From Swiss-Prot:
Any one GO BP annotation for this protein: lignin metabolic process
EC number, UniProt record: 1.14.14.91
Protein's recorded name: Trans-cinnamate 4-monooxygenase
Residues the entry annotates as binding heme: 447
The species this protein was found in: Glycyrrhiza echinata (Licorice)
Length: 505
């Protein structure tokens, strides 16, 4: 850092300190704020709680300060909600007031400051984007149209694993093949495209760029520059990398997928009724002037992250729990054999006849929630919550993982026990009918991808279990299920090697 930058930084810190003290005194008189650790000027609670605001750390703070508490992270207010009643207020009762999204400096880059659907503020743009995305992605008609493709992709996974001699011996990192499956599931819907193998050069490039985007966005290491704007110059290099990755991804989406589809469609006559895949609907909306080219690319961006990676995380967690609980794995296999008969491969319509498999999926989503804090909410204006004043533009985090793992609300929540969803919690569904269990959120800003994720999870886990005995690698009794949290993600830290011993029918 040169001397001039240092002088400017120190001067800025001094001015920020005076401003923070003045604002704090004014707000203290005006607002009845939620409880929380006592902040210090400039830094707020950042030096006390650190960067890693994962679900478990926030749970520990909730045990100290209550079901609603406030963290002042530099200039940002974070309100954390940890009870079903308050979650209902945020997501349902006051869904409009808290219906916007807050973005940080990195998500501003990757979403074009909210030109997408997931991270835009609540308003006309969000309603338009949600409407445009619903028809080609999030309806029962889409499920019925594409479930054959999902079943075909799952069958290809089974065939490839059977042919791999390492699978039944030392084991393989099954996630790698499942990642290809998930890309094919979603790229069939988006572009009527698929990748032939893990070595496909375009798939390799796409996977690498998406992985780098996720790493950069989910990291906690840039929080200091987001919380304390005067420190943002120190993020210059980090943000430069983010911008480069963003531009490369959007260019790849445009050159290899969107433009290719437009060329294909220009060679034939297509009516609205004949549209084959999602991008056709989206490009039609662009032609009508409802959205622009950037919006089209950010829709593709959302699907690459929100649909592919999150479902893959849940599949990986489900496999790990089944490997570590062989008695549960056997119950799933026995149910499939008994209900469908040996050799009849699980299909999407079969899921309704397989309650124990459904319970395993629910339990995976409860204990290993892919988005444990949901996607953060924000109130555009001053609001009330739980008897407290919530300043405008506060970041609202709903600790959905703790709602689903609080022993005050669940029987032995630390156990992986699918039976709970057939016994004492048999009424609970993943669609948000119970505010203790919100793996996809609920209300206006809930995840519409639930309609795709649940059948894909069922088909994938069902076919793996009915075709293989899934085991830890030689020398291990269990898989390592250590967690890796992100800004609001939860996935397994180590991609485990799995032994898959084929069954004979």
């Amino acid at each position: 850092m040169d001397l001039l930058l240092l002088e400017k930084t120190l001067l800025g810190l001094f001015i920020a300190a005076i401003t923070a003290i003045a604002i704090s005194k004014l707000r203290g008189r005006r607002f009845k704020l939620p409880p929380g650790p006592i902040p210090v000027p400039i830094f707020g609670n950042w030096l006390q709680v650190g960067d890693d605001l994962n679900h478990r750390n926030l749970t520990d703070l909730a045990k100290r300060f209550g079901d609603i508490f406030l963290l002042r992270m530099g200039q940002r207010n974070l309100v954390v909600v940890s009870s079903p009643e308050l979650a209902k207020e945020v997501l349902h009762t006051q869904g409009v007031e808290f219906g916007s999204r807050t973005r940080n400096v990195v998500f501003d880059i990757f979403t074009g400051k909210g030109q997408d659907m997931v991270f835009t503020v609540y308003g006309e743009h969000w309603r338009k984007m949600r409407r445009i995305m619903t028809v080609p992605f999030f309806t029962n008609k889409v499920v019925q149209q594409y479930r054959f493709g999902w079943e075909s992709e799952a069958a290809s996974v089974v065939d490839d694993v059977r042919r791999n001699p390492d699978a039944a011996a030392g084991g393989i990192v099954l996630r790698r093949r499942l990642q290809l499956m998930m890309y094919n599931n979603m790229y069939r819907i988006m572009f009527d495209r698929r990748f032939e193998s893990e070595e496909d050069p375009l798939f390799v490039k796409l996977k690498a760029l998406n992985g780098e985007r996720s790493r950069l966005a989910q990291s906690f290491e840039y929080n200091y520059g987001d919380f304390i704007p005067i420190l943002r110059p120190f993020l210059k290099g980090y943000l430069k990398i983010c911008k480069e990755v963003k531009e490369r991804r959007l260019k790849l989406f445009k050159d290899y997928f969107v433009d290719e589809r437009m060329k294909l469609e220009s060679t034939k006559s297509t009516s609205n009724e004949g549209l084959k895949c999602a991008i056709d609907h989206i490009l039609d909306a662009q032609k009508k002037g409802e959205i622009n080219e950037d919006n089209v690319l950010y829709i593709v961006e959302n699907i690459n992250v929100a649909a592919i990676e999150t479902t893959l995380w849940s599949i990986e967690w489900g496999i790990a729990e089944l490997v570590n609980h062989p008695e549960i794995q056997k119950k799933v296999r026995d149910e499939i054999d008994r209900v469908l008969g040996p050799g009849h491969q699980v299909t999407e319509p079969d899921m309704q006849k397989l309650p124990y498999l459904q319970a395993v999926i629910k339990e995976t989503l409860r204990l290993r929630m892919a988005i444990p804090l949901l996607v953060p909410h924000m109130n555009l204006h001053d609001a009330k919550l739980g008897g407290y004043d919530i300043p405008a533009e506060s970041k609202i985090l709903v600790n959905a993982w703790w709602l689903a793992n609080n022993p005050a609300n669940w029987k032995r929540p630390e156990e992986f026990r699918p039976e709970r969803f057939l016994e004492e919690e048999s009424h609970v569904e993943a669609n948000g009918n119970d505010f203790r269990y919100l793996p996809f959120g609920v209300g206006r800003r809930s995840c519409p991808g639930i309609i795709l994720a649940l059948p894909i999870l069922g088909i994938t886990l069902g076919r793996l279990v009915q075709n293989f005995e899934l085991l830890p690698p030689p020398g291990q009794s269990k898989l390592d299920t250590a967690e890796k949290g992100g800004q609001f993600s939860l996935h397994i830290l180590k991609h485990s090697t799995i032994v898959a011993k084929p069954r004979s029918f």
